[in-house]
Swiss-Prot record:
It is found in: Cell inner membrane; Bacterial flagellum basal body. This is Flagellar motor switch protein FliG. The keyword Nucleotide-binding does not apply. The lineage of its organism: Bacteria, Thermotogati, Thermotogota, Thermotogae, Thermotogales. One of the proteins that forms a switch complex that is proposed to be located at the base of the basal body. This complex interacts with chemotaxis proteins (such as CheY) in addition to contacting components of the motor that determine the direction of flagellar rotation. Pfam families: FliG_C, FliG_M, FliG_N. It comes from the Bacteria. PANTHER family: FLAGELLAR MOTOR SWITCH PROTEIN FLIG (PTHR30534:SF0). Homodimer in the absence of FliF. Interacts (via N-terminus) with FliF (via C-terminus) forming a heterodimer. Interacts (via central domain or via central domain and C-terminus) with FliM (via central domain). The record marks R161 as: Part of the EHPQR-motif. InterPro entries: Flg_Motor_Flig, Flg_Motor_Flig_C, FliG_a-hlx, FliG_M, FliG_N. It is a peripheral membrane protein. Belongs to the FliG family. A motif (Part of the EHPQR-motif) lies at residues 126-129.
Length: 335
């Protein structure tokens, strides 16, 4: 019987499942994150692997000829175990969250193939809630481009509705899709996922140009100051300091209390710590390293409060035009 032709990515997935979580994790440690994500999608969708397919793959990889266990069906739980062993629970959780969308068919796929200018012309006549649902399913840079091109009186209302979205019922999404289908394109919906929320609104705002972002936020502050503050808090997190240039970091450090800086860095990545040390004098960096070393255990609440103080300083300096935070926002759409 001639060998069945197996897709390369599926072969890799079959091999990893055959290896078991421990050894598969060791292999994954040597792969880049994009490849890991592609393989996990394949593993999660692998279905039942026949003994013939397993034999064919293992014979191709001679070093695995003595594999002892039957291949399991795979699935997201298996993928999660492998990732946890390879990268630890936290990073595994983040990868799985990103992959969830890859394992589902997203609604509004026809919208992603529509010219942005045409989409703006169409959406601006829709109800703000409809626009909010549609934008929540788009990638943040695309959603930001469309939001920025909507009439000003719509922008704040739509962002507010995106931020307040949590779970949209499948019936509502289906109804919106049916209506859009008649006007734009045919689409058959199959599955739905969590959409919208403050994080989505913040991501979209991060991808807007500074002028549009400020106009929307100023208006939102007047209409719903609590929501505006919550969105603003999510728009810049402590690790985003990595996006600042050296001059901006130095300006920030001049205004930060040393104790607050040490506390804030207690919960920071090594990459961020190194960037901070690099922008200090050798003596100041040495003193800060000593303080970090001898600080001992600290409460997470204290670390977060210290980080928030520094974020507030960064926001104030940006508002004053003294520093610039790298943001998205491509060319504006001219209507």
């Amino acid at each position: 019987m001639p060998e069945k032709k197996i897709d390369g990515r599926r072969k890799a997935a079959v091999l990893l499942v055959a290896l078991g979580p421990e050894k598969a994790a060791q292999v994954m440690k040597h792969l880049d994150e994009e490849t890991v994500e592609q393989l996990v999608v394949e593993i999660a969708n692998i279905g039942r692997v026949t003994p013939e397919e397993k034999k064919q793959v293992l014979e191709e990889f001679l070093s695995l000829a003595k594999a002892k266990e039957m291949i399991s069906e795979g699935g997201i739980e298996y993928a999660k175990k492998v990732l946890e062993k390879a990268f630890g629970p936290e990073r595994a959780r983040k990868i799985i969250e990103r992959l969830t969308s890859s394992l589902q068919v997203k609604p509004f796929s026809f919208v992603r193939d529509t010219d942005p200018v045409q989409l703006v012309n169409f959406l601006q006549s829709e109800h703000p809630q409809t626009i909010a649902v549609v934008l929540s399913y788009l990638d943040p840079p695309v959603a930001a481009q469309i939001l920025g091109a909507l009439p000003e009186e719509l922008q704040t209302e739509v962002l507010k509705r995106i931020a307040l979205l949590e779970r949209t019922s499948p019936e509502v999404v289906k109804e919106i899709e049916r209506n859009l289908e008649k006007k734009i394109s045919g689409f058959v919906s199959r599955t739905f996922s969590k959409v919208g929320g403050i994080d989505t609104a913040a991501e979209i705002m991060n991808n807007l140009d500074r002028t549009t972002e400020k106009k929307i936020m100023d208006k939102l502050v007047q209409e719903n100051p609590e929501l505006a503050d919550e969105i603003r808090r999510r728009m810049f997190v402590f690790e985003d300091i990595l996006k600042l240039d050296d001059r901006s970091i130095q300006l920030v450090l001049r205004e930060v209390d040393t104790r607050d800086l040490a506390l804030a860095l207690k919960g920071a990545s090594d990459e961020l710590k190194e960037k901070i040390f690099k922008n200090m004098s050798k003596r100041a960096a040495a003193l800060l390293k000593d303080e970090l070393e001898y600080m001992g255990p600290v409460r997470l609440k204290d670390v977060e409060e210290a980080q928030q103080k520094i974020i507030n300083i960064i926001r104030r300096l940006e508002e004053a035009g003294e520093i610039v935070i790298a943001r998205g926002g491509g060319e504006e759409l001219i209507m």
